[in-house]
């Protein structure tokens, strides 16, 4: 027999692949400048100041291409055209899957519909090291990527375990 608690916890992260399609018909899309979807949760990095790994874990958990395409289709069928923010904490946490499956599927889907969405997301600065990934993102319709750059000072980055920006010229 169970009893009510103040806080409920789990040892497992939620399975993002079981997330249902949003019910876009419940909102008045005319009142929004952008819609949001999520492809992944979690981040492979361990920056001291960031709570993402505490909330969502180190291993990026992702939706599959069919889920992403179903979400795009649902938005499209509801009449949405315009900004679409992919709200992942680090969209490029699983680069291999993005390049092999997700981005090619988005490119094909978007091309058939004359690119109805202008995509934006958040990514780690190491996106700049992957020309192929950047080109695929552009082809998919990404026009903006928010990149968190805390400081160009390597000592400060080292103090907070932010190793992704070390030995990188962020000032130039």
Please give the residue ranges for each predicted region.
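Radical SAM [4Fe-4S] cluster-binding motif and immediate context
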Residues: 17-172
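Glycine-rich beta-alpha loop elements in corrinoid/cobalamin-binding modules
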Residues: 1-15
């Amino acid at each position: 027999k169970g009893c009510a608690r103040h806080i409920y916890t789990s040892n497992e992260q939620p399975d993002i692949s079981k997330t249902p399609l949003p019910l876009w018909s419940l909102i008045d899309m005319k009142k929004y400048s952008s819609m949001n979807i999520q492809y992944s949760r979690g981040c492979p990095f361990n920056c001291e100041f960031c709570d993402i790994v505490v909330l969502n874990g180190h291993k990026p958990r992702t939706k599959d291409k069919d889920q992403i395409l179903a979400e795009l289709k649902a938005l499209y069928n509801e009449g949405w055209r315009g900004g679409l923010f992919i709200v992942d904490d680090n969209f490029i946490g699983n680069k291999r899957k993005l390049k092999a499956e997700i981005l090619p599927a988005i490119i094909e889907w978007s091309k058939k519909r004359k690119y109805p969405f202008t995509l934006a997301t958040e990514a780690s600065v190491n996106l700049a090291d992957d020309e192929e990934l950047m080109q695929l993102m552009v082809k998919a319709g990404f026009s903006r990527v928010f990149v968190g750059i805390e400081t160009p000072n390597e000592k400060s980055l080292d103090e907070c375990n932010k190793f992704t920006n070390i030995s990188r010229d962020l000032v130039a």
